[in-house]
Amino acid sequence: PPRSTLFPYTTLFRSHSVSVTGDVVTFTGNKALQQEEALIFELDNPGAVGVDLPEPVTTKTRLGGLSPRASVGLPQLAEPDVVRHYTRLSQNNFAIDTTMYPLGSCTMKHNPRLNEKMARLPGFGDIHPMQPVETVQGALELIDQLAHWLKTLTGMPAVAMSPGAGAHGELCGLMAIHAALDARGESHRRRVLVPESAHGTNPATAAFCGFTVDTIPAEENGRVSVEAVKAKLGDDVACIMLTNPNTCGLFEPQIREIADAVHAAGGYFYCDGANYNAIVGRVRPADLGVDAMHINLHKTFSTPHGGGGPGSGPVVLSDALAPFAPLPFVVHGKDGFDLIEHAKDAGKAQPFGRLKGFHGQMGMFVRALAYILSHGADGLRQVSSDAVLNANYILASLKDVMSASFEGPCMHEALFDDRFLKGTGVTPLDFAKAMIDEGYHPMTMYFPLVVHGALLIEPTETESKRTLDQFIGTMRHLAEKAKAGDLAHFQAAPRLTPRKRLDETQAARKPVLRWVKPATPATVGVAQAAE
């Protein structure tokens, strides 16, 4: 029957326990509350209102004299119904605030509540980007301080603060490289070298900027060799885009030699900073020969991801690329802080002006600086150390029941492949779906592409040993269950979610973005009579 004929929601309570080192640990994960919820349109209660305001005296004062020709079709509900509806929906979400979030290459760390308190201070939370600069001196000083920290940590002389996320930062860096090459009179350099293990945004960004992508194969050890890079170099190479540590969770030991070879050939070195959390406070990208690198504040510096976002991806730049940084930027003069917003005031080459309508993600700037100041330099070094330690603890604890993709230790994330599932009939997707019933968001699947059936786990530094042991116990339990031949268990997973396995291909290719009110018997009769 249509969901509108059912109760608005149904609640099921479940719990789960796992055995960890001989002790039974009660672990509810994200399974404590599961429910079916009607659409907000299906909860429509004609005549209900949230706030009752006086009607305007004349129609001319309403919508500037305009009047709608037909009802918009928005549902009518009282405020408690709206609050309860969206609260119930939120309880079906998985979030870092509920359980460990092992999504590889995403650095899903805890978002400290102190950062949230700072971001809500009136001097930061209640300002507007179009205010006169003399009224937002504190905000401009904060941007300047954060920029100083990012330059100091990376060893880079300049930073563009406005990019809105990681891929947006890539776009900023590639546009700066494009402009620098044009200024050198070398517009023929339009080939970008990208390792096959790179994030998919790297080749996409290069292509979007008008470059041709040339793929560098990975070595058997998961790394990029300087010999493979040299074989691709030529006078048409614009840059190389390299992630370090790479998406296999491994440090690139020849990165300086690679940078020197690219520079000698006339190209630039763009470093994808997605995995900067593994080296923050310990490695300065400038010392590796980097010309441009985006920094994901929503990863390394703990600002919220996704729906809790937005993201923020400042880009640090070398001396060679600094003149091509986008507007705006903050300067400190004798009269305080000022915001340079126009090319005529910049005194630099500004070939593409702005990347965003305003000045960057101010709320994320506040949170990131609060995080940095809370930790200090020593604390940030501890962050990277603990992130690497936690990943290696998982790798060492699971490699006897799951198949590690490479020999030796990892950096910030542990990479496994599907060899341990061979002969079981269980796929990496089945394994990941079964994790949901155990209270965990799945790890990253089938990425990086250089590993068959990849399962990429990144615990970050904020998880305790107890939490890691619970996760390890669950992974061992599932691996042993798969090897024991319980194929039906995996193919039926997840069982405990309101929705089971969705047709993700159809959802992506044929999304239903508009709710259509179901036909009533009366309207059906009218339509039949018209026919």
Description of each model-found segment:
Residues 1-12:
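Short, small-residue-biased leader/transition segments that mark boundaries at the very start
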Residues 13-158, 283, 333-355, 359, ...:
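Non-catalytic terminal extensions of PLP-dependent enzymes
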Residues 80, 162, 194-195:
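Short His-Asn-centered micro-motif
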Residues 138, 168-338, 350, 425-426, ...:
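Conserved PLP-enzyme active-site core in the AAT-like
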Residues 144-148, 154-157, 162-173, 177:
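Long, K/E/R/D-enriched contiguous segments that form extended
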Residues 160, 214-216, 443:
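General small-molecule cofactor/ligand-binding pocket signal
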Residues 164, 219, 243-245, 417-419, ...:
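Short strand-loop junctions, especially beta-strand C-caps/beta-turns
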Residues 175-179, 369-374:
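Short glycine/serine- and small hydrophobic-enriched flexible loop segments
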